[in-house]
């Protein structure tokens, strides 16, 4: 299919799983009613962003993909509405814990699981305490509407993530996110940088990008929203500010993007034989 409507959800979350499932489900229904076929909720929407502090009690939040209530709820919703819902969740796998995403298709089936590759560790974002670096490698999924590539939050800052998914055949890049203020520097607003990084991926890979972020204040941290959808030239098709709750829906044209990608020549002119340094540790 040439054109597809995609959606990004933006909303605040409580620390009650059931309340958050209900809130996200409501917005998923709104997006589907507007014709969206690929609907992206924010990262770890099951509760508060617990990685602000070190607390071993939070490990109990993690569950296997087949037992997680968020995944089960989105499977049922995807099946009912016939939409794709890339679903972020806290995964337990034996002794290991991952920041993961289940790609749920329009029949409610799990196409696969991606585990976040890049794990941050800084004030307010102490993810290394809770998450093991992903062992799935980057993933893309073929859907009825093109091939989807998904990176999770911190992955979005790395051009290697986007380029790897593009080389695997991605037609659209999606980034569920939980990002906000920096507790160590109240004057630092990364929302502009955050958007520019992903707009850069859109331009340098000539690909539409969808980013979904939470809003609201949790403890001493304010999550700044600014969810957006852009086309393959980096132009905004839809965007939110720092406080709106709702649904962004826009139409992207993957065939047009493919044509523009060929015309720009970025992939034609690649020199992989020169890039060996990229795979070496510093």
Describe every region a protein language model picked out:
Residues 1-7:
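Extreme N-terminal starter segment of soluble prokaryotic enzymes
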Residues 10-15:
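Short polar catalytic/cofactor-binding loops
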Residues 17, 25-107, 111-113, 179-200, ...:
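Cys-nucleophile CN-hydrolase/nitrilase-fold catalytic domain and related Cys-dependent amidase chemistry
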Residues 19-28, 158-163:
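Short, acidic/polar
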Residues 63-66, 76, 92-172, 176-177, ...:
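Active-site catalytic loop in hydrolytic enzyme cores
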Residues 63-85, 153-247:
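CN hydrolase (nitrilase-like) catalytic-core segments centered on the catalytic cysteine
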Residues 87-89, 100-103, 139, 227-229, ...:
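Short beta-strand scaffold segments in enzyme catalytic cores
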Residues 255-282:
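A conserved C-terminal secondary-structure "cap"
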């Amino acid at each position: 299919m040439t054109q597809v409507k995609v959606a990004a959800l933006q909303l605040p979350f409580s620390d009650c799983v059931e309340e958050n499932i209900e809130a996200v489900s409501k917005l998923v229904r709104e997006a589907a009613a507007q014709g969206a076929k690929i609907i992206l909720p924010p990262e770890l929407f099951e509760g508060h962003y617990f990685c602000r502090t070190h607390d071993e009690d939070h490990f109990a939040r993690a569950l296997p993909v087949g037992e997680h209530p968020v995944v089960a709820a989105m499977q049922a919703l995807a099946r009912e509405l016939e939409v794709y819902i890339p679903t972020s969740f806290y995964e337990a796998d034996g002794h290991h814990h991952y920041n993961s995403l289940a790609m749920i298709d329009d029949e409610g089936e799990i196409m696969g699981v991606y585990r976040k590759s890049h794990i941050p560790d800084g004030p307010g974002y102490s993810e290394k305490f809770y998450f093991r670096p992903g062992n799935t490698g980057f993933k893309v999924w073929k859907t009825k509407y093109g091939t989807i590539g998904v990176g999770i939050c911190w992955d979005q800052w790395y051009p290697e993530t986007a380029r790897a998914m593009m080389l695997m055949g991605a037609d659209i890049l999606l980034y569920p996110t939980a990002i906000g203020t920096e507790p160590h520097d109240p004057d630092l607003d990364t929302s502009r940088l955050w958007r520019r990084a992903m707009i850069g991926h859109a331009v340098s890979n000539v690909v539409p990008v969808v980013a979904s972020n939470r809003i609201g204040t949790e403890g001493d941290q304010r999550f700044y929203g600014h969810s957006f959808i852009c086309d393959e030239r980096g132009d905004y098709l839809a965007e939110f500010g720092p406080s709106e709750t709702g649904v962004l829906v826009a139409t992207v044209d993957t065939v047009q993007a493919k044509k523009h990608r060929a015309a720009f020549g970025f992939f034609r002119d690649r020199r992989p034989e020169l890039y060996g340094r990229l795979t070496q540790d510093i």
